[in-house]
Amino acid sequence: MRHSLLTAAAATLLLAACQQQTKVAGSTADSPASDILYNDRDTSVSPREDFFEYANGGWIKAHPIPEDQSSWTIGHAIQEDLYVRLRSINEESLKASGGIEKKVGDFWYSAMDSATAQSQKLQPIAPELDAIAKAGDLNSLLAVMADLQVKGVGVGYNAGVYQDAKNSDVMALYLNQGGLGLPNRDYYFNSDARTTGIRNGYQQYVRSVFAALGADSATAQQKALAHLSLETRLAKASRKLEDLRDPYRNYNKMTVDALNSLCPSIRWKDALQRQDVHGVDTVIVGQPEFYKELDAALRGTPVPVLQDYLRFHLIRATAPYLDSATYGSYFTFYGKTLRGANQPKPRWKRMLDLEDNLLGEALGKVFVQEFFPQEAKDRYTRMVEDIRSALKERIQQLDWMSDSTKQKAYTKLATMKKKVGYPDKWKDFSAMKIERQPLVRNVFAANNWWHHYEVNKLGKPVDRDEW
């Protein structure tokens, strides 16, 4: 599992900030000068009419949503301080000659090398585009699809390694519906004005991708319509959001042989082996009807349309790491039209978000050395144990709970894992091949590392200590 440094560190900074608050001399119970909640009120609003605005309106007015955000909370404000600290760590790591600091520094170098990205345009993904062009039949395209999955480009379907929902002691391979460029099936079929506008914006974006690949206006439009037709077919076979909430309907364990019968075109044994998934004889399929239709779509769609489908999703997945024109088209749709942000974050913040996703624990190791000493971890660990002791006392005082039930509650309380500040054992990223090369190649390398890290868990007990 990828651990988010930004989330964990922001929580740590929030704890520290709360701990440092002290009551200002002269404040009263009615108007505590240091009471953030008190000062964030909007007293022009009656709490009887709109309690939310009364309680939060002052803070909302004082903190307008930035142009590069679609929402803004106190958590975002804390994260701004964290961004500055992480940027400082990265800049210092540029000088490192070895260790995890060098890996962090090399990633930051490629992430901030916008000049190379601008000059190379789509060249960094030329190997993948060439592989798609050379795949002249369905089986060859499916091999490319498997390779793209390993690199983090989601095409066709979603696969992941998670705890088995019916046997939480082991890890299992899950296969779920996917392969769409819009968030879920509703975006393909709802007819309200907002969804229709998003769908039209998506068509324009798809057309712009094919134009960037060299198609003239008419051909780009034709390719976009064919692409949308394929995705709409997959969306129609996908379950609605409310149907995805049923854990029993979305848990269908079957053998790989049964999966081959359900969706034979993918030839799952070959596909899994190509993705270095070995020794797996059962999988958990979330939506079997989707895989049945996926099989029909793969068999019934012309190879050139499938090639364009892979090309589009390759560029969609890598656009944030390429030149400004490619990213600009991507942001216009996914950032502005879909998400509501008026402008993108500064590049350095976007790259920190990316680094957090791919190298969060590596960056975190450097972060805690500078900003979160062992003494802080020990202090918060004691706080967790104090909470555990308080819960035990409360259980002891319950008169409605039997002694036998209390014993079970004590056992559960004692076995609850505490994870404070940072892991006791850090992941080993030494095999992740990060170099001073085009950013997208580092992204592929990191995703490849994470893919193999996850599939290596299959069939093994759950690591309860993993962050």
Question: What are these model-derived regions, one by one?
Answer:
Residues 1-7:
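Bacterial N-terminal signal peptides that target proteins for export
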Residues 14-17:
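C-terminal motif of bacterial Sec signal peptides marking the signal peptidase cleavage site
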Residues 19-21:
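Bacterial signal peptide processing site
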Residues 24-39:
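Short, Gly/Pro- and small/polar-rich lid/capping loops
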Residues 29, 43-50, 54-119:
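Active-site-surrounding "flap" and adjacent substrate/cofactor-binding loops of secreted or lumenal enzymes
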Residues 40-61, 192-211:
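Hydrophobic/aromatic-rich, well-ordered segments within soluble, folded domains that form packed cores
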Residues 93-382:
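Noncatalytic, helix-rich "gating/capping" subdomain that lines the substrate-entry/channel surface
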Residues 262-265, 284-288, 352, 356-360, ...:
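Intrinsically disordered, low-complexity linker/terminal regions across diverse proteins
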